[in-house]
Curated annotation (Swiss-Prot):
Keyword annotations from UniProtKB, A to Z: Secreted, Signal
Name of the protein described by the UniProt record: Uncharacterized protein C17orf67 homolog
Location in the cell: Secreted
Position of the signal peptide: 1-20
Main location as per UniProt: secreted
Native source organism of the sequence: Rattus norvegicus (Rat)
Pfam family, one: DUF4543
Domain of life: Eukaryota
InterPro entries, A to Z: DUF4543
Gene Ontology CC terms, in alphabetical order: extracellular region
Top-level taxonomy: Eukaryota, Metazoa, Chordata, Craniata, Vertebrata
Region feature Disordered, mapped onto this chain: 31-50
Length: 90
């Protein structure tokens, strides 16, 4: 019983005194939260925020769709169909 107690005490002391402890100080935790994730390469020009990257992607898709729509409606070769002054877009 005494050996078990000594073993548990030694392991506990080792865990709290070593650098391999899973318990972080407040300063280390804040630094870890501030640091960027490096599990995947980050794109140049984008911060490492997946939601912001996704919103930029959606914005680019919306911009491209608007350009294609205007390209169709402002095409001079299909005048009666695409003239906004005569026909309302469907």
């Amino acid at each position: 019983m005494e050996k078990l107690f000594v073993l548990v005490f030694a392991l506990t002391l080792l865990a709290f005194s070593s650098e391999a402890s899973p318990i972080l100080t407040e300063k280390q935790a804040k630094q870890l939260l501030r640091s960027r994730r490096q599990d995947r390469p980050s794109k140049p020009g984008f911060p490492d925020e997946p939601m912001r990257e996704y919103m930029h992607h959606l914005l680019a898709l919306e911009h491209r769709a608007e350009e294609q729509f205007l390209e169709h409606w402002l095409n001079p070769h299909c005048k009666p169909h695409c003239d906004r002054n005569i026909v309302q877009p469907v």
